[in-house]
């Protein structure tokens, strides 16, 4: 049934053809079940394990690796002799890497898919219905409830479907619907129609929503919608329809993979074509096909050399280390790539309640009457410190602490706060914090009584558990609460009837009243001045109301409560307590005592964090279900808006936003910093508009209502105290619910991206070097300088360790003073590409040079000529060109060992170069990252391992080197540091300014 909130109760009953007293007939139930289906959210069609595994191989880099592994595998089949074992090492290792990566990926995805299932926990198990086949109420499974059913709900029940209230069987009906609307206090419901067809959920005061909880009272209603038709069902549909986009990093790596694959394909084809003339060389036994296969193997080796196999693993490790660092700062990251996305966040959309504020209502101002002189009324105004439920804070007058017990008016005010109250404080020993038991507003009054301590109770030696209600207990021992007149919408107040605890006390019975100021003050005939009561006159009333108006608007926007006493209430037996319409009569002839102003105060550290965001070029938008006045006031308090800034086109309610034409809605999202009275759909819409401007949006939320927007935003941030649905739809959970933690996480994200750039570039310049090396040997016709298994070892192990250690580079000092980087910024700019080509060219030439040096000049080398070396394929016993040369020398392990040692040593020098993109090693010495120094030591140790520990030299086709060779290795390798220093100097002085 659409728009049930706008119809009368009679229209709703007529729509389903049902009577409130008897309910649906079995025949109607059957028809409705066929028409509307069961009252449950359908199970999500998750991806099968096989689909998830296949998805992990959609990455281009991974596919190229897979192809290389398959080809290597096929070629290994045709190997003969002792090479067979080593030939299988390469495809086997590549496959192992791919499998490990896929496992990590599948595990991440599986976690993400649990989001929609978590909604199930808000589906109630049972419901109480009236049906024609039974005289009394019956309990049935919630899934069997159908539209048109007459349902009964009472305090503590979970609402089983979206229900239009027909009758309220108690004084009031309060519902906690914070999971759905984000309202911080429970909502009072009624039965009258709400004529606005476009009312937001917060304004549908005659509806109960599926999954919300009844906080007080009892009611009967008719089911309007079930299952997917309910508000919580609509949220599920939104979540199911939201596809996760790739993170900026994933997009970058995909682009990079594409470029790499094109370059690799070109080089492989080029190497193969260059050598067509050598296919018939004697070394291949004169067989053209064997020659073709030989050069095909070299092309595959090239592909292996060009792909940074270690890159996926190093990125995963770096992100995982980043998540650990963030967890220490209370930010728990659920999906690894989002760690880096945080670094380019340009807009943070934050919930107000609990994130920017403490979600702990507290009284911050109060006043009592000081004296009345004719028409002149003077007030005593006090402010109260402390912004949580902890009973710690001071009462200040003119910014100086005062003892509340000195003021008779404050003693009475504290008495009313303590007695006209059903809530209390509780010290949670596991969390180590004070928590509310009951209503937020009432708990604020309980906390105020503890801070005031009007009877100077000795509290210093009490334990935290005893301290929670110490001062309230003293007041409750003096007066005994007889009964409560519950809050009702018509009089907007509640009261308690109290008698003195000691029978011969000087005071008689009293009624203490608290409620909305305008309602209570209208029923006050007197005001309390000290211990006397003075008649309430027009000017006095005006003065009181003007202060309340001032507190309720402007910067403070406090929620004010008036407190009053009826000094001589009627006798108890004269009062009719089961008729709430009479309560107004009993709460008349009141004496006004004072007013308290409370708010959900901003967290202390938020203001500094907002300033940090401003410096870092990040816009903060507050989004809340609260009303606009409160929202703007909090924005001014925390620095989103200036004190006197005109916010005409920078703050909107959900309704105002909807009324704008589409083009203006887009513009509003570009400018605005505050949205109030919003619904879940608004949040998703705002994210969509921001994304259309290429903004990277972080969205916070804690309720079920926030889940679609959390899923849609690039970074969904859930609160630690939030619902399971919000947590599972998000990328990050704030353990302490604190906005400042987001800012710390953004800083960490930026540092991670910078470090990631460094190690990606480090690995790539290494691969460029390997490619140049293989290309040169093939183009010049030299013997192989490096074989695939050696390249794999370098790419995975020797390069992998320093690359991972580069993830520990300290963040730049000005990291939060720069604007967010644009997601479109390339990983490697033109100048950097030139730099890697230059360094890579040197690496390749040095590696080939080291191998050639052994053939041409080494003491223990064969001293062949350059011509013999470049035509070694033609070498045979009978060739006059190779007289006195043993052809087997061209397959000796020494030149390969020289080449590999130079490659590894240069890579270690390169790792030092990568400490900073443009800073000289003189300014940023190696020991700023001690992990890097350690990893270089470890990499060199592993290199010595494959040189000097049997049987490794045989597997890797290497030979032990002596000091003479090592000195040559250093001479060839160290110049790379000088070369990079020159390039950094150019970048610093000619390109950065």
From Swiss-Prot:
Gene (name only): ATP2A1
Lineage: Eukaryota, Metazoa, Chordata, Craniata, Vertebrata
Organism of this sequence: Bos taurus (Bovine)
Annotated residues for binding of Mg(2+): 351, 353, 702
Swiss-Prot/TrEMBL cofactor(s): Mg(2+)
Positions of disulphide bridges: 875-887
Assembly behavior: Interacts with sarcolipin (SLN). Interacts with phospholamban (PLN). Interacts with myoregulin (MRLN). Interacts with DWORF. Interacts with VMP1.
Family matches, as PROSITE patterns: ATPASE_E1_E2
Name of the protein described by the UniProt record: Sarcoplasmic/endoplasmic reticulum calcium ATPase 1
Cytoplasmic side: 1-48, 111-253, 314-756, 808-827, 917-929, 985-993
PANTHER family: CALCIUM-TRANSPORTING ATPASE
GO MF entries: ATP binding; ATP hydrolysis activity; metal ion binding; P-type calcium transporter activity
């Amino acid at each position: 049934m659409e728009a049930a909130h706008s119809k009368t109760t009679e229209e709703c009953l007529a729509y389903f053809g049902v009577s409130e007293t008897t309910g649906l007939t079995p025949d109607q139930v059957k028809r409705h079940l066929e028409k509307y289906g069961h009252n449950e959210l359908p199970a999500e069609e998750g991806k099968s394990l096989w689909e998830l595994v296949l998805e992990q191989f959609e990455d281009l880099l991974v596919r190229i690796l897979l192809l290389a592994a398959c080809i290597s595998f096929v070629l290994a089949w045709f190997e003969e002799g002792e090479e067979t074992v080593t030939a299988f090492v390469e495809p086997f290792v590549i496959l192992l890497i791919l499998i490990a990566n896929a496992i990590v990926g599948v595990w991440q995805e599986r976690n993400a898919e649990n989001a929609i299932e978590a909604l199930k926990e808000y589906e109630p198990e049972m419901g109480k219905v009236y049906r024609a086949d039974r005289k009394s109420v019956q309990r049935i499974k919630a899934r069997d409830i159908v539209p048109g059913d007459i349902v009964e709900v009472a305090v503590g029940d979970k609402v089983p479907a979206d229900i239009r209230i027909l009758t309220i069987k108690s004084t009031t009906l309060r519902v906690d619907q914070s999971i759905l609307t984000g309202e911080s206090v429970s909502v009072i419901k009624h039965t009258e129609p709400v004529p606005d067809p476009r009312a937001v959920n917060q304004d549908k005061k005659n509806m109960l929503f599926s999954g919300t909880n009844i906080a007080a009272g009892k009611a009967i209603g008719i089911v309007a919608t079930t299952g997917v038709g309910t508000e919580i069902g609509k949220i599920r549909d939104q979540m199911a329809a939201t596809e996760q986009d790739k993170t900026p990093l994933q997009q970058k790596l995909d682009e990079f993979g594409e470029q790499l694959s094109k370059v690799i394909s070109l080089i492989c084809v080029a190497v193969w074509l260059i050598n067509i003339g050598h296919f018939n060389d004697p070394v291949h036994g004169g067989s053209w096909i064997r020659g073709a296969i030989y050069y095909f193997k070299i092309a595959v080796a090239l592909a292996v050399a060009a792909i940074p196999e270690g890159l996926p693993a190093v990125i995963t490790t770096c992100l995982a280390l980043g998540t650990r660092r963030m967890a220490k700062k209370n930010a728990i990251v659920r999906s690894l790539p989002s760690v880096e996305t945080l670094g380019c966040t340009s807009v943070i959309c934050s919930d107000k309640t609990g994130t920017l504020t403490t979600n702990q209502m507290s009284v911050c101002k109060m006043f009592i009457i000081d004296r009345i002189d004719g028409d002149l009324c003077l007030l005593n105004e006090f402010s109260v410190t402390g912004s949580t439920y902890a009973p710690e804070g001071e009462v200040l007058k003119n910014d100086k602490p005062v003892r509340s017990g000195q003021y008779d008016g404050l003693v009475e005010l504290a008495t009313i706060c303590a007695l006209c109250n059903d809530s209390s404080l509780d010290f949670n020993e596991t969390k180590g914090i004070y928590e509310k038991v009951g209503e937020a507003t009432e708990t604020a009054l309980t906390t105020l009584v503890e801070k005031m301590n009007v009877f100077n109770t000795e509290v210093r030696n009490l334990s935290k558990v005893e301290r929670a209600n110490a001062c309230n207990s003293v007041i409750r021992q003096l007066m005994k609460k007889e009964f409560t007149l519950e809050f009702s919408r018509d009089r907007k107040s509640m009261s308690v009837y109290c008698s003195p605890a000691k029978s011969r006390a000087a005071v008689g019975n009293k009624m203490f009243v608290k409620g909305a100021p305008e309602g209570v003050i209208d029923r006050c005939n007197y005001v309390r001045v000290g211990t006397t009561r003075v008649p309430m006159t027009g000017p006095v009333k005006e003065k009181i109301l003007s202060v309340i108006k001032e507190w309720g608007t402007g910067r403070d926007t406090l929620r004010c409560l008036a407190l009053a006493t009826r000094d001589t209430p009627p006798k108890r037996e004269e009062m009719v307590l089961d008729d709430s319409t009479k309560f107004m009569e009993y709460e008349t002839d009141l004496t006004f005592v004072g007013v308290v102003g409370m708010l959900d105060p901003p967290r202390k550290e938020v203001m500094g964090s907002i300033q940090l965001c401003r410096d870092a070029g990040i816009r903060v938008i507050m989004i809340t279900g609260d009303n606009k006045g409160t929202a703007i006031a909090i924005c001014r308090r925390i620095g989103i808006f200036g004190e006197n800034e005109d916010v005409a086109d920078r703050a909107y309610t959900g309704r105002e936003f909807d009324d704008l034409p589409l083009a203006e809605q887009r513009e509003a999202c570009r400018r605005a910093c505050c949205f109030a009275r919003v619904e879940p759909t608004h949040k998703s819409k705002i994210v969509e508009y921001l994304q259309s401007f290429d903004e990277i949006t972080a969205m916070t939320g804690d309720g079920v209502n926030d889940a679609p927007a959390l899923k849609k935003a690039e970074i969904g941030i859930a609160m630690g105290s939030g619902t399971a649905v919000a947590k599972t739809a998000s990328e990050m959970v704030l353990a302490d619910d604190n906005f400042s933690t987001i800012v710390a996480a953004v800083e960490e994200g930026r540092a991670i991206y910078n470090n990631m750039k460094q190690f990606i570039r480090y690995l790539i310049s290494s691969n460029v070097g390997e490619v140049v090396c293989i290309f040169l040997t093939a183009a010049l016709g030299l013997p192989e300088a490096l074989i695939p298994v050696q390249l794999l070892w370098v790419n995975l192990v020797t390069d992998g360790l320093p690359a991972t250690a580069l993830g520990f580079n300290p963040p730049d000092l000005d990291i939060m003073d720069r604007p967010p980087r644009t997601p479109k910024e390339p990983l490697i700019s033109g100048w950097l590409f030139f730099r890697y080509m230059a360094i890579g060219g040197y690496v390749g030439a040095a590696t080939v040079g080291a191998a050639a040096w052994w053939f041409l000049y080494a003491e223990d080398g064969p001293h062949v000529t350059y011509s013999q070396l470049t035509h070694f394929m033609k070498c045979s016993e009978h060739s006059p060109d190779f007289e006195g040369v043993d052809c087997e020398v061209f397959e000796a392990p020494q030149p390969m060992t020289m080449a590999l040692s130079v490659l590894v040593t240069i890579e270690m020098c390169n790792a030092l170069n990568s400490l900073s993109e443009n800073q000289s090693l003189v300014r940023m010495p190696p020991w700023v990252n001690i992990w890097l120094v350690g990893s270089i030591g470890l990499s060199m140790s592993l290199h010595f391992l494959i040189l000097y520990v049997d049987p490794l030299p045989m597997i890797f086709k290497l030979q032990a080197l002596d000091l003479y060779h090592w000195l040559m290795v250093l001479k060839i390798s160290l110049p790379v540091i000088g070369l990079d220093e020159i390039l950094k100097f150019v970048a610093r002085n000619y390109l950065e300014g």
